[in-house]
C-alpha cells in the first residue's frame, strides 16, 4: 500500500515495536495532524487497528472532530472490560482512561503516572494494599487488567469519599484528595449552598 510506505507511517510503526510511549505519541499526533480528508482518517483507523495503537485511534478521532471531518468510528472510542463489581462505573472508567492515556497501555506521564488509568506508583501501591493485591510497578504498564483493577478501585474510593460527587472524585483522582480538600477549604464546597456567580 502506498500509505504504508510514507516515511511518517514507517516511523510510527517502528516506534510501536521499539520506542517508548512518549516517542510513539509524537508520531501518532503528527499522523493525525497531517490527515486532511475522510480517506486520510480512515487510513489512520486502519493503521491504528493493524498496529494495535488504540491511542492513535483516539487521537485520530479528536483530530477528525476538530477538523469537521466525519471519520469517527470504533477506533475513536475503544472499549475495555472493567473489573467485576465496577460495572456501574463503566462510563467513568472509560472517560478517565480516554482522557488520561488515550487507552495506551504503556503510557507514562511526565509526572510518572503509569498505564491505562495513569496511576502514580504511590497511589497504586496504596490501592493494591486496599485490594489485597501484590504491588508490582512493571504491571502498571505491562498488565492492563491490573492497572484497570487498581484504577477502578481508586476512583470508586474517591466517589465514596466525596459522597458520589463526580467533579470532586475526578479532581481527586487526577490531583489527589489532599489538593481537593485544600481547594474546598479555600473556596468552599460546591455541594453546600448556592454558587455565587
Regions found by a protein language model. Name each.
Residues 1-2, 8-11, 18, 23-197:
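Catalytic glycan-binding domains that act on GlcNAc-containing polysaccharides
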